[in-house]
């Protein structure tokens, strides 16, 4: 039987693009781990993706994951759009390169051994873990320490 893990994620960007951060909380039984990091120049969508990626990459064995995000971009991208992108060699339906392809590919890899249920929650609606992730992400965005090497303006 796989371990059942809950993951809560959020991304934040002060300006878009601008300094950004992500926050994630992993919960297994009564154990909890909080993750966050800030980037000097990025976008909100990249930080939403990073929150999910880093949280999944933190897991050390195959798990059954309930991943909660307030990002429709992440949820729809990973449950719907990614299948077409992969069929079209990471191009959109109108043959343009997929935005944030580096992170979509990394997320696809991070899912690997896990069974992930992607659950959308309304942001800024009083959901305690989402509020905590938002605070982690905003705090990290306010004190960025890393460069988002995959971000390209435009």
Curated annotation (Swiss-Prot):
Question: Which residue intervals define the domain RNase H type-1 in the entry?
Answer: 1-142
Per UniProt, the cofactor note for this protein states:
Binds 1 Mg(2+) ion per subunit. May bind a second metal ion at a regulatory site, or after substrate binding.
The protein's predominant localisation is: cytoplasm
Could you tell me which PROSITE patterns the record lists for this protein?
A: RNASE_H_1 (PS50879)
Q: Which reaction does it catalyse?
A: Endonucleolytic cleavage to 5'-phosphomonoester
BP term (GO), one: DNA replication, removal of RNA primer
One GO cellular component this record assigns the protein to is: cytoplasm
Give the matching Gene3D superfamilies. Ribonuclease H-like superfamily/Ribonuclease H
Which cofactors go with this protein? Answer: Mg(2+)
Enzymatic class? hydrolase
Does the keyword Oxidoreductase feature in the UniProt annotation?
Answer: no
Keywords (A to Z) from UniProt? Cytoplasm, Endonuclease, Hydrolase, Magnesium, Metal-binding, Nuclease
Localization (cell):
Cytoplasm
Give a single Pfam family match.
Answer: RNase_H
Q: Report if keyword Isomerase is assigned.
A: no
Q: In which residues is Mg(2+) 1 bound?
A: 10, 48, 70
Q: What EC numbers are recorded for this enzyme? A: 3.1.26.4
A Gene Ontology molecular-function term?
Answer: nucleic acid binding
Q: How does it assemble?
A: Monomer.
The entry's function note states:
Endonuclease that specifically degrades the RNA of RNA-DNA hybrids.
Q: Which family does it belong to?
A: Belongs to the RNase H family.
The name under which this protein is listed is Ribonuclease H
Which organism is the protein's source? Answer: Edwardsiella ictaluri (strain 93-146)
| Protein encoded by which gene | rnhA
């Amino acid at each position: 039987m796989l371990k059942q893990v809950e993951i809560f994620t959020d991304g934040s960007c002060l300006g878009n693009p601008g300094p950004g951060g992500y926050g994630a909380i992993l919960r297994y039984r009564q154990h909890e781990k909080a993750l966050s990091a800030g980037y000097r120049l990025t976008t909100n969508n990249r930080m939403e993706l990073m929150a999910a990626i880093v949280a999944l990459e933190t897991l050390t064995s195959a798990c059954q994951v309930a991943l909660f995000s307030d990002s429709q971009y992440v949820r729809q991208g990973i449950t719907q759009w990614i299948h077409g992108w992969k069929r079209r060699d990471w191009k959109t339906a109108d043959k343009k390169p997929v935005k944030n392809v580096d992170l979509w590919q990394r997320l696809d890899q991070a899912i690997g051994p896990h069974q992930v249920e992607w659950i959308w929650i309304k942001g800024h609606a009083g959901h305690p873990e989402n509020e905590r992730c938002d605070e982690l992400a905003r705090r990290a965005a306010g004190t960025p320490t890393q460069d988002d090497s995959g971000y390209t303006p435009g």
